[in-house]
């Protein structure tokens, strides 16, 4: 009997100890923060491009003026935050459609508007096309990703550009057919341009804006300031 009592007491004590251990507060698990992975390394922009100007001689640009740009960005997350710094490199092309004859001579570069350009059957489109080598820089802010990995994003930055080529393209009637004329050079188109950028989006789709703090032409050309508004597709 004594042995049975001792055995029952031992079992009771063992169960009590097990119950006490089960009810102890679990040890606090240290939360580890996962480092943000580089993202948005490729960017493709489609933009409406136009010019702020004070020309009062009838010069006008068209709503069909547009641009395209492609960039590779080096995304560097800042420690474990949702902020990153991204320098990059790429190319951009801008086409400014207008209603004028672009002339460059010893006195400078200027636009001579063509009377009744829209109704004139002797002329079709005219544009100034400029190609740039771009160096963009963005400071990026990301929200917490959802279940699919998508997130809201905001990027403020600056883009510096080096002019590669500037070409005037015309389509004029010659006798009974239209002839395309290309004129290269235009040294009065500024060699450098730069300005702030803004990008706001969700997932891989973004709204993009750029405003140049430099003018399209140097001092020998008309005072015109470029700007761009469009969409930006990002990935990887």
Residue map of PLM features:
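Surface-exposed strand-loop-strand hairpins of Gram-negative outer-membrane beta-barrel proteins
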Residues: 50-71, 188, 217
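Residues on the lipid-exposed face of transmembrane beta-strands in outer-membrane beta-barrel proteins
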Residues: 70-76, 89-91, 135-141, 156-160, ...
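Extracellular/periplasm-exposed beta-strand and loop segments of Gram-negative cell-envelope proteins
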Residues: 57-63, 97-108, 112-130, 163-174, ...
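Short loop/turn motifs that connect adjacent beta-strands in outer-membrane beta-barrel proteins
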Residues: 28-40, 77-84, 144-152, 167
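Structural signature of outer-membrane beta-barrel domains
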Residues: 49-51, 92-96, 142, 161-165, ...
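Residues that define the transmembrane beta-barrel architecture of outer-membrane proteins
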Residues: 38-40, 62-68, 129-135, 150, ...
């Amino acid at each position: 009997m004594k042995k049975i009592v001792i055995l029952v007491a031992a079992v009771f004590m063992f169960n009590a100890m097990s119950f006490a251990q089960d009810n102890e507060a679990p040890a606090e698990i240290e939360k580890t923060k996962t480092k943000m992975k580089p993202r948005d390394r490729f960017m493709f922009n489609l933009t409406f491009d136009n010019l702020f100007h004070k020309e009062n001689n009838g010069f006008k640009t068209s709503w069909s003026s547009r641009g395209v740009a492609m960039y590779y960005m080096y995304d560097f997350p800042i420690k474990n935050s949702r902020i990153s710094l991204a320098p990059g490199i790429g190319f951009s092309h801008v086409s400014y459609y207008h209603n004028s004859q672009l002339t460059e001579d010893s006195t400078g570069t200027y636009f001579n508007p063509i009377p009744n350009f829209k109704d004139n059957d002797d002329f079709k489109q005219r544009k100034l096309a400029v190609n740039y080598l771009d160096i963009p820089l963005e400071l990026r802010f990301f929200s917490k990703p959802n279940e699919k990995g998508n997130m809201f994003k905001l990027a403020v930055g600056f883009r510096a550009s080096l002019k590669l080529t500037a070409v005037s393209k015309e389509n004029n009637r010659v006798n009974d057919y239209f002839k395309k004329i290309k004129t290269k050079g235009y040294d009065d188109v500024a060699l450098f341009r730069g300005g702030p950028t803004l990008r706001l989006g969700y997932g891989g789709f973004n709204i993009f804006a750029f405003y140049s703090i430099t003018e399209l032409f140097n001092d020998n050309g008309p005072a015109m300031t470029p700007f761009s508004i469009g969409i930006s597709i990002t990935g990887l």
